[in-house]
Amino acid sequence: MAARLRERYEKEIRSELMKELGFANPMQAPKLEKIVVNMGLGEAINNGKIIDASVEQLSAITGQKPVVTKARKSIANFKLRQGQSIGAMVTLRGDRMYEFFDRLVSIALPRVRDFKGVSPKAFDGKGNYTLGVREQIIFPEINYDKVEKIKGMNITVVTTARNDEEGRALLRHLGMPFRQ
């Protein structure tokens, strides 16, 4: 069964975007390409167990096993060696991506303390949107009692939009709560 948000995009949102942006061909309408969830774990240099806990939490949040990112080069000031594990990331595509985006905008973001909406300025000039989450406990899949340390993550939504206006229109139609 296809993701609920994907079906809504194909049935309603794509045609609304075509009218709004003045496209004739449905393939011109912007769509989600992938979502990258990255958790940088600088403190993993001193404590290797943090990586395992974070990998477990990221896989619970995204439904996919994360890849452990390693340091590209040694930095003496940070006590960092080349090849040392310093983070975890997941790239979501297809139905998992739509399901994650749906959970993010409808369940997780409203659980952020003092949430007034996400910044409409965090686009990169090519229609992609990046947002930082300060706590992983906003996701319902995370058991608050088992969390040792509260960690944040970066969520990048990559779209096929050609510019920020198209990307903003797409995310607004998909339900992203932008600040006014």
UniProtKB/Swiss-Prot annotation:
Signal peptide bounds = none
Name a GO CC annotation attached to this entry.
Answer: ribonucleoprotein complex
Which keywords describe this protein according to UniProt? Ribonucleoprotein, Ribosomal protein, RNA-binding, rRNA-binding, tRNA-binding
The cross-references to InterPro entries, in alphabetical order and at most eight, read: Ribosomal_uL5 (IPR002132), Ribosomal_uL5_bac-type (IPR020930), Ribosomal_uL5_C (IPR031309), Ribosomal_uL5_CS (IPR020929), Ribosomal_uL5_dom_sf (IPR022803), Ribosomal_uL5_N (IPR031310)
One GO biological process term: translation
Q: A Gene Ontology MF term for this entry? A: rRNA binding
Q: Which family does it belong to?
A: Belongs to the universal ribosomal protein uL5 family.
Q: What does this protein do?
A: This is one of the proteins that bind and probably mediate the attachment of the 5S RNA into the large ribosomal subunit, where it forms part of the central protuberance. In the 70S ribosome it contacts protein S13 of the 30S subunit (bridge B1b), connecting the 2 subunits; this bridge is implicated in subunit movement. Contacts the P site tRNA; the 5S rRNA and some of its associated proteins might help stabilize positioning of ribosome-bound tRNAs.
Check the record and name the NCBIfam families matching this protein. Answer: PRK00010.1 (NF000585)
Which HAMAP family does its entry note? Answer: Ribosomal_uL5_B (MF_01333_B)
Q: How does it assemble?
A: Part of the 50S ribosomal subunit; part of the 5S rRNA/L5/L18/L25 subcomplex. Contacts the 5S rRNA and the P site tRNA. Forms a bridge to the 30S subunit in the 70S ribosome.
- Protein name, as recorded: Large ribosomal subunit protein uL5
Which source organism does the UniProt entry give? Answer: Anaeromyxobacter sp. (strain Fw109-5)
